[in-house]
């Protein structure tokens, strides 16, 4: 019976479900995992980089982590093409706010604007939901460091630590057991490596398999630093984690 409700985005099933939104969520469950952890001095984003073929040329640029503005980064899980559209939209909205008010847009206000667009694609005929979830990491003078998660329905929430994509349930279970409010950025980075190593189907992590990004505040210049890590920086944190594992 439910098949007659599948093709139309805007029609609820008798059980009150929107199947197209559920299918979009299912696409995210087949994507690589991405996670975010808030520390007292910054935020860590980490993501699995899936290598589909040995013949594929490896790029230095990240494919799951993106800059949105000077005070905000994001991680994505799902359809990358859909993510690119929403990221470009978020960048335009942020730049328009910056030009108008001469300051960076508050994080939650920007997340809400993007989620309003995503929600519209679940409500109008002839459209389909965006098949991508986001983790937004940012800072503003109102609430400090913030981590938001959003899904194709347009819902969003604020978190201290969360994950999206495949194996996200396992990562969230580990987060509930091990996350603490007073960790610093180095501890959060080590925790992110630990969570990825326990959930990915791999004997050893390398910079080719994961991506890292951090957002911190440079107190000397009084500005935010949103940084997507290079290969040697990722290897450094991986080596530290492996050394800790050997000693334990």
UniProtKB/Swiss-Prot annotation:
Domain of life: Eukaryota
UniProt xrefs under PROSITE patterns: PROTEASOME_ALPHA_1, PROTEASOME_ALPHA_2
Matching InterPro entries: Ntn_hydrolases_N, Proteasome_alpha, Proteasome_alpha-type, Proteasome_asu_N, Proteasome_bsu_CS, Proteasome_sua/b
Location of this chain's protein in the cell: Cytoplasm; Nucleus
SMART domains: Proteasome_A_N
GO annotation terms (biological process): proteasome-mediated ubiquitin-dependent protein catabolic process
Recorded GO CC terms: cytosol; nucleus; proteasome core complex, alpha-subunit complex
Keyword annotations: Cytoplasm, Nucleus, Proteasome
Family designation: Belongs to the peptidase T1A family.
Name of protein: Probable proteasome subunit alpha type-3
Source organism per UniProt: Schizosaccharomyces pombe (strain 972 / ATCC 24843)
């Amino acid at each position: 019976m439910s098949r007659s409700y599948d093709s139309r985005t805007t029609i609820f099933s008798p059980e009150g479900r929107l199947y197209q939104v559920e299918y979009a969520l299912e696409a995210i469950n087949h994507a690589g995992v991405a996670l975010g952890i808030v520390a007292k001095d910054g935020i860590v984003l980490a993501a699995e980089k899936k290598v589909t073929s040995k013949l594929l040329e490896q790029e230095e640029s990240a494919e799951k982590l993106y800059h949105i503005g000077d005070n905000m980064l994001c991680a994505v899980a799902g359809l990358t093409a859909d993510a690119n559209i929403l990221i470009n939209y978020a960048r335009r909205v942020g730049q328009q706010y910056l030009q108008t008010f001469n300051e960076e847009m508050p994080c939650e206000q920007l997340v809400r604007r993007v989620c309003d667009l995503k929600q519209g694609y679940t409500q109008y005929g002839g459209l389909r939901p965006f098949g991508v979830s986001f983790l937004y990491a940012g800072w503003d003078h109102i609430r400090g460091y913030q981590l938001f998660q959003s899904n194709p329905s347009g819902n969003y929430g604020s978190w201290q630590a969360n994950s999206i994509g495949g194996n996200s349930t396992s990562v969230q279970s580990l987060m509930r057991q091990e996350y603490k409010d007073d960790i610093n950025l180095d501890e959060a980075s080590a925790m992110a490596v630990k969570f990825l190593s326990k959930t990915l189907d791999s004997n050893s992590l390398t910079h080719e398999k994961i991506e890292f990004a951090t957002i911190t505040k440079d107190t000397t210049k009084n500005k935010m630093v949103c940084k997507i890590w290079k290969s040697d920086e990722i290897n450094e944190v991986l080596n530290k984690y492996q050394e800790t594992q050997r000693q334990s």
